[in-house]
Amino acid sequence: MTPPSGVAGQGQGSGLPRRAPCLTGDPGFLHQESEMHVPTTAIRPQLDIRAQAPVPTKHGVFQMLVFHFGGTTSPDQGLSPDHVALVMGDVRGRSDVTLRVHSECLTSEVFGSLKCDCREQLEAAQAEIGRRGLGVVLYLRQEGRGIGLANKIRAYQLQAFGHDTVDANRILGLPDDARGYEPAAAMIEHLGIESIRLLTNNPDKVDALRALGVRIASRSAAIVPANPFSAPYLEAKRLRMGHVIPSLRDGEGAAVGDAE
Protein backbone atom coordinates (compact mmCIF):
# COMPACT_ATOMS: atom_id res chain seq x y z
CA MET A 1 0.00 0.00 0.00
CA THR A 2 1.38 3.40 -0.92
CA PRO A 3 2.18 5.46 2.16
CA PRO A 4 0.36 8.82 2.54
CA SER A 5 2.09 11.73 0.87
CA GLY A 6 3.72 14.46 2.89
CA VAL A 7 5.73 14.46 6.09
CA ALA A 8 5.63 16.50 9.24
CA GLY A 9 6.36 20.13 8.52
CA GLN A 10 5.05 20.11 4.93
CA GLY A 11 1.83 21.81 3.84
CA GLN A 12 0.32 18.83 2.06
CA GLY A 13 -3.16 19.07 3.59
CA SER A 14 -3.80 15.38 4.30
CA GLY A 15 -0.11 14.46 4.66
CA LEU A 16 0.89 12.56 7.78
CA PRO A 17 4.33 12.11 9.38
CA ARG A 18 6.08 8.86 8.46
CA ARG A 19 6.88 8.08 12.08
CA ALA A 20 5.87 9.47 15.42
CA PRO A 21 8.58 11.13 17.51
CA CYS A 22 10.47 8.90 19.91
CA LEU A 23 12.87 9.38 22.76
CA THR A 24 16.45 8.47 21.94
CA GLY A 25 19.61 8.59 24.01
CA ASP A 26 19.54 11.22 26.74
CA PRO A 27 15.93 11.48 28.01
CA GLY A 28 16.49 15.22 28.37
CA PHE A 29 16.15 15.54 24.61
CA LEU A 30 13.35 14.89 22.18
CA HIS A 31 14.39 13.75 18.71
CA GLN A 32 12.20 13.87 15.60
CA GLU A 33 13.04 12.68 12.07
CA SER A 34 12.31 16.22 10.85
CA GLU A 35 15.64 17.12 12.52
CA MET A 36 14.00 19.48 14.99
CA HIS A 37 16.20 18.76 18.02
CA VAL A 38 14.75 20.44 21.09
CA PRO A 39 16.28 20.34 24.57
CA THR A 40 13.88 20.22 27.50
CA THR A 41 16.33 22.16 29.63
CA ALA A 42 16.20 25.94 30.00
CA ILE A 43 16.65 27.89 26.77
CA ARG A 44 16.94 31.26 28.47
CA PRO A 45 15.92 32.46 31.93
CA GLN A 46 12.26 31.59 32.65
CA LEU A 47 11.75 29.68 29.38
CA ASP A 48 11.70 25.88 29.11
CA ILE A 49 10.62 23.36 26.47
CA ARG A 50 8.20 20.84 27.95
CA ALA A 51 7.08 18.73 24.97
CA GLN A 52 7.08 18.38 21.17
CA ALA A 53 5.05 16.32 18.69
CA PRO A 54 3.65 16.46 15.15
CA VAL A 55 0.00 17.51 14.96
CA PRO A 56 -1.93 16.83 11.73
CA THR A 57 -4.50 19.50 10.80
CA LYS A 58 -6.64 20.19 7.76
CA HIS A 59 -3.98 22.72 6.75
CA GLY A 60 -1.10 20.26 6.97
CA VAL A 61 1.11 18.79 9.67
CA PHE A 62 2.56 21.20 12.22
CA GLN A 63 5.17 20.52 14.86
CA MET A 64 3.68 21.57 18.20
CA LEU A 65 6.18 22.74 20.81
CA VAL A 66 5.02 23.48 24.35
CA PHE A 67 7.04 26.18 26.11
CA HIS A 68 6.86 27.00 29.81
CA PHE A 69 7.52 30.65 30.58
CA GLY A 70 7.43 31.30 34.31
CA GLY A 71 7.39 35.06 33.92
CA THR A 72 3.78 35.02 32.65
CA THR A 73 2.26 33.15 35.57
CA SER A 74 -0.77 35.07 36.90
CA PRO A 75 -2.77 32.52 38.91
CA ASP A 76 -5.05 35.22 40.30
CA GLN A 77 -6.33 35.81 36.75
CA GLY A 78 -6.17 32.19 35.64
CA LEU A 79 -3.46 32.83 33.06
CA SER A 80 -1.28 29.88 32.05
CA PRO A 81 2.53 29.98 31.86
CA ASP A 82 2.47 27.38 29.06
CA HIS A 83 2.56 28.68 25.49
CA VAL A 84 2.57 26.89 22.14
CA ALA A 85 4.50 27.19 18.88
CA LEU A 86 2.94 25.56 15.80
CA VAL A 87 5.76 25.25 13.28
CA MET A 88 5.55 24.17 9.64
CA GLY A 89 8.73 23.66 7.66
CA ASP A 90 12.35 24.38 8.51
CA VAL A 91 12.30 27.96 9.79
CA ARG A 92 15.76 28.06 11.38
CA GLY A 93 17.94 30.69 9.75
CA ARG A 94 15.10 31.82 7.48
CA SER A 95 14.09 35.41 6.82
CA ASP A 96 10.61 36.83 6.22
CA VAL A 97 8.93 33.82 7.87
CA THR A 98 5.14 34.12 7.93
CA LEU A 99 4.23 34.25 11.62
CA ARG A 100 1.21 35.06 13.73
CA VAL A 101 1.37 35.84 17.44
CA HIS A 102 -2.10 34.80 18.60
CA SER A 103 -3.57 35.20 22.07
CA GLU A 104 -5.89 32.60 23.54
CA CYS A 105 -9.64 33.14 23.12
CA LEU A 106 -11.63 30.34 24.75
CA THR A 107 -14.99 31.88 23.98
CA SER A 108 -14.56 31.96 20.20
CA GLU A 109 -12.06 29.16 19.58
CA VAL A 110 -13.83 26.53 21.72
CA PHE A 111 -17.42 27.71 22.13
CA GLY A 112 -17.89 29.54 18.83
CA SER A 113 -18.64 33.01 20.23
CA LEU A 114 -19.36 35.55 17.49
CA LYS A 115 -18.30 38.58 19.56
CA CYS A 116 -14.78 38.68 18.09
CA ASP A 117 -12.75 37.49 15.10
CA CYS A 118 -10.12 35.50 17.03
CA ARG A 119 -11.16 32.06 15.82
CA GLU A 120 -11.27 33.20 12.20
CA GLN A 121 -7.87 34.91 12.48
CA LEU A 122 -6.29 31.76 13.88
CA GLU A 123 -7.85 29.64 11.15
CA ALA A 124 -6.77 32.09 8.43
CA ALA A 125 -3.19 32.13 9.73
CA GLN A 126 -2.95 28.33 9.71
CA ALA A 127 -4.45 28.20 6.24
CA GLU A 128 -1.98 30.73 4.86
CA ILE A 129 0.98 28.93 6.43
CA GLY A 130 -0.34 25.67 4.99
CA ARG A 131 -0.49 27.18 1.51
CA ARG A 132 3.07 28.47 1.83
CA GLY A 133 4.37 25.30 3.47
CA LEU A 134 6.42 27.39 5.91
CA GLY A 135 5.50 29.46 8.92
CA VAL A 136 4.70 29.66 12.60
CA VAL A 137 1.75 30.35 14.87
CA LEU A 138 2.72 31.36 18.40
CA TYR A 139 -0.27 30.73 20.68
CA LEU A 140 0.04 32.77 23.87
CA ARG A 141 -2.10 31.81 26.86
CA GLN A 142 -3.24 35.32 27.75
CA GLU A 143 -7.02 35.22 27.63
CA GLY A 144 -9.01 38.42 27.22
CA ARG A 145 -6.08 40.58 26.12
CA GLY A 146 -4.28 39.46 29.26
CA ILE A 147 -7.00 40.10 31.88
CA GLY A 148 -8.04 36.46 32.27
CA LEU A 149 -11.24 34.58 31.54
CA ALA A 150 -13.30 35.69 34.55
CA ASN A 151 -12.54 39.37 33.96
CA LYS A 152 -13.25 38.92 30.26
CA ILE A 153 -16.72 37.56 31.00
CA ARG A 154 -17.32 40.43 33.45
CA ALA A 155 -16.42 42.79 30.62
CA TYR A 156 -18.83 40.93 28.33
CA GLN A 157 -21.62 41.59 30.84
CA LEU A 158 -20.85 45.32 30.72
CA GLN A 159 -20.78 45.18 26.93
CA ALA A 160 -24.29 43.70 27.04
CA PHE A 161 -25.37 46.99 28.64
CA GLY A 162 -23.88 49.04 25.80
CA HIS A 163 -20.27 49.67 26.83
CA ASP A 164 -17.58 48.95 24.25
CA THR A 165 -14.59 46.69 24.90
CA VAL A 166 -12.35 49.56 26.04
CA ASP A 167 -14.82 51.19 28.44
CA ALA A 168 -15.83 47.81 29.87
CA ASN A 169 -12.22 47.10 30.86
CA ARG A 170 -11.81 50.56 32.36
CA ILE A 171 -15.00 50.30 34.42
CA LEU A 172 -13.51 47.13 35.91
CA GLY A 173 -10.27 48.97 36.66
CA LEU A 174 -8.38 46.94 34.07
CA PRO A 175 -5.99 48.04 31.29
CA ASP A 176 -7.17 48.26 27.69
CA ASP A 177 -4.59 45.63 26.77
CA ALA A 178 -2.57 43.75 29.40
CA ARG A 179 -0.77 41.38 27.05
CA GLY A 180 2.98 40.86 27.08
CA TYR A 181 5.08 39.47 24.23
CA GLU A 182 8.23 38.33 26.03
CA PRO A 183 7.32 34.64 25.52
CA ALA A 184 6.81 35.24 21.80
CA ALA A 185 10.18 36.95 21.43
CA ALA A 186 11.89 34.13 23.34
CA MET A 187 10.24 31.46 21.18
CA ILE A 188 11.20 33.26 17.96
CA GLU A 189 14.79 33.45 19.19
CA HIS A 190 14.80 29.76 20.09
CA LEU A 191 13.41 28.76 16.69
CA GLY A 192 16.32 30.60 15.07
CA ILE A 193 14.17 32.80 12.84
CA GLU A 194 16.08 35.71 11.31
CA SER A 195 13.08 37.91 10.53
CA ILE A 196 9.32 37.58 10.27
CA ARG A 197 6.37 38.60 8.12
CA LEU A 198 3.94 39.36 10.92
CA LEU A 199 0.24 38.69 10.44
CA THR A 200 -1.46 41.39 12.52
CA ASN A 201 -3.65 44.47 12.38
CA ASN A 202 -2.21 45.82 15.63
CA PRO A 203 0.62 48.40 15.37
CA ASP A 204 1.23 48.13 19.12
CA LYS A 205 2.08 44.45 18.69
CA VAL A 206 4.61 45.38 16.00
CA ASP A 207 6.20 47.97 18.28
CA ALA A 208 6.25 45.63 21.29
CA LEU A 209 7.96 42.81 19.39
CA ARG A 210 10.52 45.16 17.86
CA ALA A 211 11.28 46.56 21.31
CA LEU A 212 12.05 42.97 22.37
CA GLY A 213 14.53 42.55 19.53
CA VAL A 214 12.36 40.74 16.98
CA ARG A 215 13.21 41.65 13.38
CA ILE A 216 9.97 42.33 11.49
CA ALA A 217 10.57 42.43 7.75
CA SER A 218 6.95 43.28 6.95
CA ARG A 219 3.44 43.36 8.34
CA SER A 220 0.50 41.74 6.60
CA ALA A 221 -3.13 42.34 7.44
CA ALA A 222 -5.11 39.69 9.30
CA ILE A 223 -8.58 40.81 8.27
CA VAL A 224 -11.43 38.33 8.12
CA PRO A 225 -15.17 38.73 7.47
CA ALA A 226 -17.03 40.32 10.37
CA ASN A 227 -20.54 39.59 11.58
CA PRO A 228 -23.21 41.76 13.25
CA PHE A 229 -21.96 40.71 16.71
CA SER A 230 -18.24 41.27 16.09
CA ALA A 231 -18.51 44.49 14.05
CA PRO A 232 -19.00 46.83 17.06
CA TYR A 233 -16.04 45.21 18.85
CA LEU A 234 -13.79 45.53 15.81
CA GLU A 235 -14.92 49.11 15.26
CA ALA A 236 -13.91 49.96 18.83
CA LYS A 237 -10.49 48.39 18.22
CA ARG A 238 -10.13 50.47 15.04
CA LEU A 239 -11.23 53.79 16.56
CA ARG A 240 -9.91 53.47 20.12
CA MET A 241 -6.99 51.03 19.96
CA GLY A 242 -5.47 51.99 16.60
CA HIS A 243 -5.94 48.69 14.79
CA VAL A 244 -5.44 48.97 11.03
CA ILE A 245 -8.73 47.58 9.75
CA PRO A 246 -11.48 48.96 7.50
CA SER A 247 -14.61 50.43 9.00
CA LEU A 248 -16.95 47.60 9.93
CA ARG A 249 -20.11 49.53 10.73
CA ASP A 250 -21.82 47.65 7.91
CA GLY A 251 -20.83 44.31 9.47
CA GLU A 252 -18.61 43.26 6.58
CA GLY A 253 -14.86 42.78 6.32
CA ALA A 254 -12.34 41.94 3.65
CA ALA A 255 -10.38 38.79 2.86
CA VAL A 256 -6.95 38.22 4.35
CA GLY A 257 -4.34 40.04 2.28
CA ASP A 258 -1.11 41.95 2.41
CA ALA A 259 -1.08 45.41 3.95
CA GLU A 260 0.56 48.36 2.29
Predicted feature residues:
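Basic polycationic patches enriched in arginine
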Residues: 18-19
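General helical secondary-structure elements
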Residues: 14-15, 234
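Catalytic domains of riboflavin
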Residues: 29-260
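Low-complexity, intrinsically disordered or signal/transmembrane-proximal segments
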Residues: 10-12, 31-32
